[in-house]
């Protein structure tokens, strides 16, 4: 865990700071170990429930990466058991959780900043429909790009990514 964040921290070459958060204390400990192993000095990991607003972070982030919990339907090659475990009601619960998290973390983006929404699923409800829901409820954002990658397209896992920009209002 933390691989994308570590990569971003390295690309910043010390010119910025990366704060990565996860609700799981165990995952945070793994991220901290990876930070040490990669000798990244401009990154910290914190245990935090993304549904809970951090008042001190509102309007301060140039970029928020919302890499949200999802059904994982884009990684069936690696985890084929998902198709047997995942039920329609599970996906509905995940969509509700994703929306709750988005409703909180978007506040951290400063005007002119960006929010990256990503999942490792190919489910439209968790992807395009969530972005449409978010845009209908947060007019201060605009979609800059949105892409669904299917597993057979690049020979990789399936995933979704949308880049949203907070307008200067």
Question: Which ranges hold each PLM region?
Answer:
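S-adenosylmethionine
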Residues: 1-169
């Amino acid at each position: 865990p933390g691989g994308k964040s570590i990569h971003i921290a390295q690309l910043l070459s010390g010119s910025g700071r990366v704060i990565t958060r996860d609700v799981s204390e165990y995952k945070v400990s793994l991220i901290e170990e990876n930070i040490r192993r990669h000798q990244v000095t401009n990154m910290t990991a914190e245990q935090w429930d993304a549904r809970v607003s951090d008042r001190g972070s509102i309007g301060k982030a140039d970029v928020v990466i919302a890499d949200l919990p999802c059904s994982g339907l884009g990684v069936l090659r690696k985890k084929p058991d998902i198709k047997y475990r995942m039920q329609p009601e599970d996906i509905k619960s995940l969509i509700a959780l994703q929306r709750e998290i988005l409703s909180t973390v978007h506040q951290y983006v400063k005007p002119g900043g960006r929010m990256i929404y990503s999942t490792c699923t190919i489910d439209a409800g968790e992807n395009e429909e969530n972005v449409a829901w978010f845009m209908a409820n947060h007019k201060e954002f605009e979609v800059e790009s949105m892409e669904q990658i299917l597993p057979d397209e690049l020979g990789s896992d399936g995933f979704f990514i949308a880049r949203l920009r907070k307008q200067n209002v």
